[in-house]
Design a protein with these regions (language model features):
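Gram-negative outer-membrane beta-barrel transporters
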Residues: 550-626
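Outer-membrane beta-barrel signature, preferentially recognizing the C-terminal barrel domain
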Residues: 345, 398-399, 473-521, 526, ...
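Short, acidic, small-residue-rich periplasmic hinge/interaction motif at the N-terminus
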Residues: 3, 12-56, 74-76, 82-86, ...
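Short acidic/polar hinge/loop motifs at secondary-structure boundaries
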Residues: 62, 95-122
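Transmembrane beta-barrel wall of Gram-negative outer-membrane proteins
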Residues: 163-195, 206-253, 281-289, 453, ...
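N-terminal periplasmic accessory domains that precede
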Residues: 18-21, 62-65, 103-106, 120, ...
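Face-selective signature of the C-terminal outer-membrane beta-barrel domain
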Residues: 225-247, 278-435, 458-462, 516-522, ...
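Extracytoplasmic beta-strand/coil segments of soluble accessory domains associated
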Residues: 63-99
């Protein structure tokens, strides 16, 4: 608006007032509060969408939000969907080319306040890579404000058993005219501890062997990510981003192995003790870079063209030593039974990726198509020094993988009530390599076709039906391609396989949603060439060979249900449950070494409580339970977990305090395998009670140009 203007005039005839210049008047509002409620869960054509601000209001980071997202499992190894498998992770529709601890560290750097949605695409369009046998997880960030500079800083402290861990993340965002920029810096300490106890019984030999291991580790990590976008015109923009994530760690394992004879009375007679200690140091780093170009068309809003070029580099080095002594039950050393090794393994991976995507409107629908190429080289080295019990060894394998892809997606409404989306993706994979200078002749090149289908029927606003099907794959990690022996102790040797193929999964699902809050899904699927660790035990020597192989074949049929309730102002809850039958066989080609079939049920509850009318004081509690199931050939015992959290927001939303606890309810996971020759079971303890305290302070202000300043306004009013 403008300031009031007053002028006293004496009118004695015609009068020309000339130009009347009014002075602009601005009034800065301290805060504007808009009260409303978005649904916490929304099912769209090909995805389930969760409101990130509501699903985990007490969370501190994107990682904490994913921990509390129904159906999502977060571990040190990455992100997966419970009962369905691994996913690829996107941020704002762009793939995050990190995995393992580097991915976990990156997700820690995003504060919860920056997140808008968590999207789970179990039937993603053909545009997305066929990897991720359970689909795609897309994290949508809030859009940058126009003419704004600001960010956030978030210190966090975590207490896990006797370890106090810390982290500090900071974010800066800038948007002015044609320039958008962001910078993320984060670092801290990570730590873990637990126990893994395994027990092997050989009935025919009458022997029993136990191996009980306690482990702990800790180390620093750091991550940096920077992005810059420039809009040449409203329809043409170009940008680039880089990230760098180094990490170090030191760990220690204390192992107590024992050999027994099973007497006729079923009692165990101790024959030998083999106490051992291992110290490990590892360091790794991810480096990524991206350049992208995006073009839209004013004459056709749905038409778009985009180009991306990426580089991904990974370096990993692990130093390990292990020493054990053989002792009689009375503690007397056993000559020739000592075992020792000093080993160094490293992995170098470089990937270069480029893609071109185009979308064209066709009537009420759209046609998308594109091409992509990926060129990757991986080098794995394994070295054991001369003092090792197995002798001096030096091995090197180089593996090249080239993937070329073409895809087409078509989306069109068939009527006011029917919608169709279908797609086809073709990927050609060429592989080559050398093992210690010898060319790998048995590697194969192959062509895969991946169809996708979605058919939706919405008779009215209350009901929605869907039918969708897809075929997806899961490529092996490059570390799984190393065939060299990796000793844990004298009884356990792990290996990869140089000619591992991608695992494939086909899935068909029928869904129904009522009022956007009650959802049912009936699905069936088949996994073949599944990549798993095949365990073979020698009953005579008790030596176990654990090898990555395309050895899993699994049929799955399930019924899934979810319900969202928010009919009262102080409470909301999301309930998800699934009942499925699986038939799993583990064994190369047509053989079956072990596995099993049976029903499994899981249920998860995510509850949010609002303790005041403004909803600035909130609490959450979550619960998860799963009955015994089969996974990777193991029969796994039941799983129970639960957590709770509190958050309080003040200073008009700028300061946020959060306290949450994971594994308030928890149990150790028990696994077992039974074959005609042996039985092995394990007890895995790694779910310790963890307390997190986080503080997030957000800052920022509009960027005012000279024409916006009051002094400039007053001067202009005088001209």
């Amino acid at each position: 608006g403008y300031r009031p203007y007053h002028q006293t005039l004496t009118i004695a005839g015609a009068l020309d007032l000339g130009e009347l210049l009014l002075t602009e008047e601005t009034k800065e509002l301290s805060a504007v509060q808009v009260t409303g409620r978005r649904p916490i869960m929304l099912r769209k054509a090909d995805r389930m969408v969760f409101d990130a601000t509501q699903i985990a209001p007490a969370a501190s980071s994107a990682l904490d939000v994913l921990r509390q997202t129904p159906g999502v499992n977060v571990s040190d190894g990455g992100i997966s969907l419970i009962g369905k498998g691994g996913v690829i992770v996107l941020i704002n529709d762009k793939r995050v080319r990190l995995s393992g601890s580097a991915l976990i560290s990156l997700l820690r750097s995003y504060p919860q306040s920056d997140l808008q949605e968590i999207q789970i695409l179990t039937t993603p369009p053909a545009k997305y890579e066929a990897e991720g046998n359970a689909g795609v997880l897309n994290i949508i960030l809030k859009k940058a404000k126009n003419d704004f500079f600001g960010g956030s800083i978030a210190p966090r402290f975590r207490l896990r058993k006797d370890k106090i861990l810390y982290s500090l993340t900071s974010n800066l965002n800038y948007k002015k005219d044609k320039v958008t920029a962001s910078l993320q810096l984060g670092g801290g300490s990570s730590g873990y501890d637990g126990r893994l106890d395994t027990y092997r019984t050989y009935p025919k030999q009458g022997t029993f062997h136990s191996s009980e291991t306690a482990y702990s580790g800790q180390g620093p990590y750091f991550n940096l990510r920077a992005g810059l976008d420039y809009a040449f015109t409203p329809e043409l923009s170009m940008g680039a981003s880089i990230s760098y994530s180094p990490e170090k760690g030191n760990s220690r394992r204390e192992n107590d192995s024992r050999d027994y004879r099973i007497l006729s009375s079923k009692a165990y007679e101790l024959l030998r003790l083999l106490p051992g200690v291992a110290d490990e140091t590892d360091k790794s780093q991810y480096t990524t870079a991206n350049v992208h170009l995006e073009k839209s068309f004013k004459s056709a809003p749905k038409r778009s063209l985009s180009w991306d070029a990426d580089y991904v580099g990974y370096r990993s080095q692990e130093g390990r030593n292990f020493t054990s002594r053989g002792l009689m039950p009375n503690g007397t050393p056993i000559p020739g039974s000592d075992f020792h090794f000093d080993a160094l393994t490293d992995q170098h991976t470089d990937s270069y990726i480029t893609s071109l995507d185009y979308t064209e409107p066709i009537g009420k629908g759209t046609l998308s198509f594109g091409a992509k190429g990926t060129w990757t080289r991986t080098t794995n080295r394994s070295d054991y020094d001369a003092k090792s019990s197995m002798g001096e060894r030096h091995d090197k394998i180089t593996f090249d993988e080239h993937v070329y892809a073409l895809y087409a997606d078509f989306k069109h409404p068939l009527s006011d009530k029917w919608n169709l989306r279908t797609g086809l993706r073709m990927e050609y994979t060429h592989t080559a390599g050398e093992n210690n200078g010898r060319r790998l002749e048995h590697l194969r090149s192959y062509l895969n076709i991946f169809p996708t289908l979605f058919l939706g029927f919405n008779p009215n606003d209350r009901h929605a039906f869907s039918l969708n099907g897809t075929v997806r794959l899961n490529r092996p990690h490059f570390g799984q391609l190393s065939p060299f022996a990796d000793y844990e102790n004298q009884y356990s040797i792990m290996r990869g396989k140089e000619d591992l193929r991608a695992a494939k999964r086909a899935k068909l699902a029928l869904g129904y949603t009522f009022l956007g809050a009650l959802d049912f899904q009936l699905d069936g699927g088949y996994l073949w060439d599944g990549i798993t660790q095949v365990i073979r035990l020698d009953p005579v020597t008790n030596q176990g060979s654990i090898t990555h192989d395309n050895a899993e074949k699994t049929w799955t049929f399930g019924l899934e249900n979810s319900f969202f309730f928010n009919k009262v102002s102080f409470f909301q809850t999301y309930i998800s449950q699934r009942l499925w039958y699986s038939d799993m066989k583990i064994g190369p080609e047509s053989t079956s070494l072990y596995g099993g079939a049976g029903l499994t049920y899981h249920v998860s509850l995510n509850n949010t409580f609002f303790f005041n009318r403004s909803k600035t004081f909130q609490g959450t509690c979550s619960f998860y339970y799963r009955t015994p199931s089969y996974d990777g050939g193991f029969h796994m015992g039941h799983v129970i977990s639960g957590g709770a959290g509190l958050s309080y927001t003040l200073l008009q939303g700028k300061l946020r305090l959060a306290l949450d606890a994971y594994n308030l309810l928890r149990n150790n996971l028990r696994l077992n395998i039974t074959t005609p020759d042996y039985e092995m079971y394990a007890n895995n303890e790694n779910s310790a009670l963890t307390l997190n305290l986080g503080v997030t302070y957000s800052f920022g202000a509009p960027i005012r140009g000279k024409s916006e300043r009051k002094s400039a306004q007053e001067l202009r009013s005088r001209m």
